[in-house]
Amino acid sequence: MVYSRRGSLGSRLLLLWLLLAYWKAGSGQLHYSIPEEAKHGTFVGRIAQDLGLELAELVPRLFRVASKGRGDLLEVNLQNGILFVNSRIDREELCRRRAECSIHLEVIVDRPLQVFHVEVAVKDINDNPPRFSRQEQRLFILESRMPDSRFPLEGASDLDIGANAQLRYRLNPNEYFDLDVKTNEEETNFLELVLRKSLDREETQEHRLLVIATDGGKPELTGTVQLLINVLDANDNAPEFDKSIYNVRLLENAPSGTLVIKLNASDADEGINKEIVYFFSNLVLDDVKSKFIINSNTGEIKVNGELDYEDYNSYEINIDAMDKSTFPLSGHCKVVVKLLDVNDNTPEMAITTLFLPVKEDAPLSTVIALISVSDRDSGANGQVTCSLMPHVPFKLVSTFKNYYSLVLDSALDRESVSVYELVVTARDGGSPSLWATASVSVEVADVNDNAPAFAQPQYTVFVKENNPPGCHIFTVSARDADAQENALVSYSLVERRVGERPLSSYVSVHAESGKVYALQPLDHEEVELLQFQVSARDAGVPPLGSNVTLQVFVLDENDNAPALLVPRVGGTGGAVSELVPRSVGAGHVVAKVRAVDPDSGYNAWLSYELQPAPGSARIPFRVGLYTGEISTTRSLDETEAPRHRLLVLVKDHGEPPLTATATVLVSLVESGQAPKASSRASAGAVGPEAALVDVNVYLIIAICAVSSLLVLTLLLYTALRCSAQPTEAVCTRGKPTLLCSSAVGSWSYSQQRRQRVCSGEAPPKTDLMAFSPSLPQGPTSTDNPRQPNPDWRYSASLRAGMHSSVHLEEAGILRAGPGGPDQQWPTVSSATPEPEAGEVSPPVGAGVNSNSWTFKYGPGNPKQSGPGELPDKFIIPGSPAIISIRQEPTNSQIDKSDFITFGKKEETKKKKKKKKGNKTQEKKEKGNSTTDNSDQ
């Protein structure tokens, strides 16, 4: 049983202790007390220790004290955590005569944020002596007054409170008067002078007394007042009031002129001694006289000034009623006016901001400001509630009575709203309710949460080649939605290699302006497309960035003159010699001039003109405008000059056009002497090379065999490669592809030349395309224009490749096999029939998108081809020039070269004779025919 009682008692004590600890933790408030008038540095309390804070945490956690009203009274030493008096504290000045006087402090520490409330009670000391309103009080007393008559006196006042304000009075010893002290309901002392002995005016007309007031403090303080008593003669009945004390309740907002009370005094005398006048006693303070007025005849007291419950909630008015006798008698009463509070004071707010500006990434519940509210009214009129304007990312949290915290309620975004103008409304509980507003400007500080953004992900720039070094080609601009250094954007190149050189050797970008400069002259023949990225990065911490792609297309200019493809044959002064039989007719192809231009478009479109020699007669030759074929204009006869010097001018279509000149020496020989003369000319011109003529047949057969094998290999490789997954375009550097197309097929060849499209970093690749020839389906196929092949894509490396068929023959690539698909190209042909074997018409939009040209046959020279024959034309992509190879019917007597240039030609073909039983002769004739075709 004993154990059970002890356990129950222990449980109750533990529960009581837990409740007490919970109450203390919930209140979070410390209480100290200090006496007023304490000196500077007076110890108040170890506030850091009492709050559970370490001394080393005070400075790092930004320990600070905020107080309402004067903030310099108390201070905290951050070294030892002691709260001490910083300046003089006068309780009477701070709290007037309120019973409780306290200084409220707010202790704030960060990391994490904590707010503690500290209340320092100011204890009263006896530092104010009792004081009378006047140094001398005058009384008029009739000599006829009976002993025990009482006369009210003005008491002293003490600004202190409690025991220090409890006053005791005494009167200096005399034989006529005593001092009586009474206490009313409000514990206020009333002094009355009591007559103990009848007065005799004839003996003494005036009495001087000294009233001494002593307070209850230690040490005691005193105050004195001099009483001057004048003894009046005979009026034995004084006016009397119904009550000695009148209590009146009055609204504090009563207007001026409002009746407070009407007093009535009576006098038992007759005549003039009965007539009474009313007036304020000399005991009434001037402040009270300014608030009220009394009618001396009627005794009505009215409001004369503005009343305020918050200043004084009650007034004591001493009224004297005196008759009009020569020796007047007076009666006395007191009117106590108690004011009733009305809701006439709006709430007041004090806002202490803590963290401004607020970072836009601040966590939720971050305390922005502390708000304290007050209302001078009392009761429900003084109960204040706060509210915040709606639709803002903040809220008010009530911490203690009349204290609120402004905290972050939702995420901030400075780019949406940079400043919040908050309106806090404080409203009291009166009826009608009064309210007040206060504005809090909350600035949102920027954090680097936005990367620079370009207007578009890719820009296309066109730059002419041969630009001056350092020229400005483009300006990139990125916008950052952040502010200040977070929006300061700098630009840089995303470095990589363009072929074998770094990107920075081609272009540079200004870090601040974003201007892109070309560091060196660009060459369209070397680089057609320069693709790179520019990075924009802000100055935030950490920095954010983004990239934009620039495609710089290098536009071609006519900076390359046509280059002649001259075979290595003998001649005088670099001229080419040709032997032509006199028996040839009109249209016989004598030779073909070939030239290439590294430019593209119109700049690479070549035309040929025959320049007449000075002083020479009209020559029987002409040159194809776009083919470069030199042919006869008429039949030659014996009257023609034996030697002709032809000047062929090769000109492109650029602005301005560039030219080159080729010289061809044409010698006319007899028909029977043409092969021999040619052999002798070759032997005399090239010397040891004449011995190779006999082996031409075997050499051509070997070349054809090897070329056929190579073509089959390339076809197989192309088929395998086309079946693979296509890859993105990269920066290529290799041999551009030349496509040669005809009715029997298309061929391709490559020539070593730098041609790059700079859009990546992959190693250079060689574009090599081969197509199998196909036979025409019918005679009408030559008259119908061919439609573009949708499967063909124009490679960038093909556009500048323009080379002669001689190189094709030397490389052994120009071959065709039967049965292949016919490669078709977009063509623009002249609608006007030409008497010449082949002409071309300029393309529509040449130099822009047209890079292929087709040869058109006139009606007089229909296109005829058979299986195994060489094509009649081929196209050089990237150039308007079409190398045309004209084929004549098999029974034609005119020897027209198909793929020969500047070579030696035989006068006529050998006629084939059919002889039965002589197979050896038939094979010999076929061998000679093959030799003729290979020479051509």
UniProtKB/Swiss-Prot annotation:
Q: Which GO terms describe its biological process?
A: cell adhesion; homophilic cell adhesion via plasma membrane adhesion molecules; nervous system development
In its UniProt record, a GO molecular function of this protein is: calcium ion binding
List the SUPFAM superfamilies hit by this protein, alphabetically: Cadherin-like
The entry's cellular-component GO terms read: plasma membrane
Question: From what superkingdom does this record's organism come?
Answer: Eukaryota
Region forming the signal peptide: 1-28
Q: Composition bias, kind Polar residues: at what positions?
A: 774-786
Membrane-crossing ranges are: 697-717
Question: Known SMART domains for this protein?
Answer: CA
Q: What does this protein do?
A: Potential calcium-dependent cell-adhesion protein. May be involved in the establishment and maintenance of specific neuronal connections in the brain.
Give the protein name, as stated in the record. Protocadherin alpha-5
